[in-house]
Swiss-Prot record:
It comes from Listeria monocytogenes serovar 1/2a (strain ATCC BAA-679 / EGD-e). This is GTPase Der. GO terms for biological process: ribosome biogenesis. Residues 4-167, 176-351 form the EngA-type G domain. Gene3D superfamilies: 3.30.300.20, P-loop containing nucleotide triphosphate hydrolases. CDD domains: EngA1, EngA2. PROSITE patterns: G_ENGA (PS51712). PANTHER family: GTPASE DER. It holds the Pfam family KH_dom-like. Residues 352-436 form the KH-like domain. GO terms for molecular function: GTP binding; ribosome binding.
Amino acid sequence: MAKPVVAIVGRPNVGKSTIFNRIVGERVSIVEDVPGVTRDRIYNSAEWLGKEFNIIDTGGIDLSDEPFLEQIRAQAEIAIDEADVIIFITNGREGVTDADEQVAKILYRSNKPIVLAINKVDNPEMRDQIYDFYSLGFGEPYPISGSHGLGLGDMLDAVRAHFPKEEEEEYPDDTVKFSLIGRPNVGKSSILNALLGEDRVIVSDIAGTTRDAIDTTYTFDGQDYVMIDTAGMRKRGKVYESTEKYSVLRAMRAIERSDVVLVVINAEEGIREQDKRIAGYAHDAGRAIIIVVNKWDAINKDEKTINVWTEDIREQFQFLSYAPIVFVSAKTKQRLNNLFPLINQVSDNHSLRVQSSMLNDVISDAVAMNPSPMDKGKRLKIFYTTQVAVKPPTFVVFVNDPELMHFSYERFLENRIREAFPFEGTPIRVIARKRK
C-alpha cells in the first residue's frame, strides 16, 4: 500500500517551508553523493509515531508567473487532488487575512481532512490570539512555532489520526505490479495502449486502493500483471498541468505500489532534469527500474545513435547504472515486445535471494583483491555478510567499526556482488553494522 500523503498549504510567508523541513528533519539530506541524483525539496518522506507518510510543500512549486490568487488556488488544488490530509498553515502574528479566507473557501469544498495550524506562536502569551482562527471553520486550531519546533507533536498527532486505514493489496503474490512514469507528454499513455493490444487478455479496469488511480490487470504468456496508473495519465486541464515539478508528485503513489518502474523518456526532447528527479525517486524507493526511450521512430538515426544515447543516459543517470535501457516506439510498436520479458526479468532479480556461503565467498575474494584503506591507523575488518531482505535485495555486512566503511568501498562491494549475481534492473543496498 502507498504511504499516506500530507500536503502543506497556505498563503505566502506563513512559514510552510520551515515547517516542512522540521517535519522531514534529516531526511532532507542527500543520501547518495552521486552525480545525477537530483533532489527536489517540494516533497519528502517523514515519519510520526512509527507511521511513514509523504509530505508535499506546495509553496515550493514555482508558480511565479501566475497572479497571486491563482498561485494560492493552484496550491490548494494540488493538495486537494493529491493529499489524504491537508495541513493549512496560517500566521499567528498577522491574524486571519483575506488570503487565508480565500484558501479556506477552496479547502472547505474539498471534503478532505484539514488540520489548521497557526504558525509563529513563539511564546505562551500569543496563544490568546488563536481564537480568531476558529472563524475559518476547521475546528480547533493548533498553535505551533516552526522556527522553535513548538507544538508540532500535537499537530502531527491530529494529522496521523486522519490517515486512511491500511488496506491489503488484493493481488496474488506472483502478480507483477508495474507503472510507467515520466514527464507530461513523453508517451506513457501511448505505450500503455500499445501494450494492451490484441495479444493481451484484459481482465478488468478497477479502482485501485489508491484514490484517483486505475489498476489495469491483465495476463500475457501466462503471467498476471497489474499496471498501476499515475492519475496524471487520465486527467488533464488543471491549472498546474504545465508545472513539471508536479509530475513527480503524481508519480509518487504509483512508484510505491509498484514492483517495477518504467521511466519513460521522450527521444524528441532528450533528457531533462525532471526525468532525473522522477527516476531518483524510484531509485530511492528501492524499485526495480527499466529506462524506456520512447518516440524512437521520430528522430534521425544512424548506426551510432543508440550507442550515443546509451552513453548519455549512463552519464546523466549514473545512479541507475544497473537499469536496462530499451529504445521503443509506441506508434510503430518497435521493440515493445521486449518490455514484458524484461519486466519479468528485473522483477525476478528484485526478489532474488542468494546463498550465504556463496555471498561470503564473493565478499572474501573482493577483500583479498582490494583490502579497505587504513583510516587513522585502523582498517575495516569484515566478519561476515548476510542478505536480510528482497525488493530491493539488501545485504548487511558485519564489521569491526561501521565508521570505517567508506562510501567508495561500499560501492566497490556492491559492484562485486553485482558481478557475481544477476541483479540487473534492481538497486541493491549494502549496510555496515558492528558485530556484537
